Amino acid sequence: MANGASAPIPTPQFPTHNAPRVWLLTSGDSPIGISVAKQVLDHGDYVVSGIIQADFEDESVRSEEFKSFLSEVVRTNGWKDRLKIVPLDIRQCQAAIAEAVHVFKKVDILFCCTSEAIIGTVEELSASHRTLTMVRDQFEKNFFGPMNIIKAVIPHMRALMNGHIIVLAGITGHLGTPGLSMYCASGWALEGFCDSIAYEIAPFNIKLTIVQASVEIGILTNKITSAPPMKEYSRDFGHTAPNFRGLLDGLINRLPGIRAQYPPPPEREIQSPSSEAERQSGPYLLSRNEVVSLYPPLSHAHTEKLIAETVHALTAIGGHENPPARHIVGVEGVASVKEKLKTVSEELEEFVDTSASADIVRQGPGVGRASSVMDVDIKDLEGDVFDASLGLR
C-alpha cells in the first residue's frame, strides 16, 4: 500500500484563493468523501455532500461512519452552516447542482469519487443473467454516474467562466489487472471521456484533473461485489496467471473480526484456496459459489492511513489556478505507471519498422512518404476504395 502503518498523515495544504470555495462531492459518505469534507470545512470552504438515500438509511458500517461525521459537524463551530447534504444518484444530477447553487450560489469544485468494484474474470462475469447485470451496474456506477454529474455541472461552470472538475480514478486506468477487467474497463472509459472533454471545456476556464490513486484506495474503501468463481481459473487447475480475487481474498481474510462477521461456509463451497491449511483458515468470502457483496471492514485508523496521501493531493490540487491534467498518488503508483510506459515504449521501438511500413507512399519524382492518410489527396484513393467496396478488386 502507498501508506505504511508508521507513515505520518501529511498536513493539509491548499492553493491560494481569494474567497471560500464550494465543493460538490459525489459520494459524501465514502471514507474519501468524509475526509475531504472535514479538511475543506476546517479550511473554511463550503461542502455539498451527495449521498444515496438508501445507503444512508441502512445499518452498515459506512452509514454509521457518515452519521458520526454529521455529529462532528454539529459539534464543530462554523461547520453546520457550510455543509449541505443532497440526494444524488444517476437520475438526480441536475437537481443536485440546482440545490447546490440555490444554497451556496455556485459550485467551484466538483469532486467525483463514486466507485465500486466487480471482481471476476470475463467468463465468470458472463456466466448468468445476474453476473451480466453486475457488469452493467459497474458501468452505471463508475462511468455513467460521473459522466452525468460532469455533464450537469458544465453549463453552470461555463456561465461562471470558472471551475475545476476532479475525478478520482486509479492506476488501473494505466494498468490492466486480471480479475478486474470490468473495473478497469469502466475506469479507462471514464478517463477517455475526461481526456476528451478537457479540451472542450478549456476555453471556458474549466479545468479537469484525473487523480490516479493506488488500487487499494478504489477497492478497499468502496463496495466490492464478486461473481462466483470458475474452477478453471484456480491454481488447483493449473491456472498460473495472477488473479486479483485471490490476492484480495487473502487480504480480507486477515482483517480483524472478519470471521465473526462472515462465518466460514462449508468446504465444498470454496473454489480458490489451494491447500487444506488455506481452507481451514477461511472464510474466503470472495471465493464462495454465490454473488458476495461487502464493504471491507477496515478500522478507522487503518482507513485514515490508507487514504491520507490521496486526500492530501486532493486538497492541494482542488481549485488550483493551473492544476495537472493527471496526478498519480504515491511512489508505488508512479513506479508502476513508469514501468508500463517503459514496456509500451520498448514494444513501440521493436515494431516501429512495421508501423512505418503501413504509411501511404506517394508516387512520382521528388515525392516522399506521406506522414499520414490526411496528407494524401482523397482523389488518389477514390478509385481503389470504390472498386474494393463493389468487389471489383
Mark where each language-model region is.
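Rossmann-fold cofactor-recognition segment
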Residues: 73-93
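Conserved Rossmann-fold cofactor-binding substructure of NAD(P)-dependent oxidoreductases
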Residues: 89-104
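Conserved mid-core segment of classical short-chain dehydrogenase/reductases
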Residues: 117-136, 179-182
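Active-site helix of classical SDR
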Residues: 150, 186
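Residue(s) in the substrate-gating loop at a strand-loop-helix junction
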Residues: 170
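SDR active-site lid
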Residues: 203-323
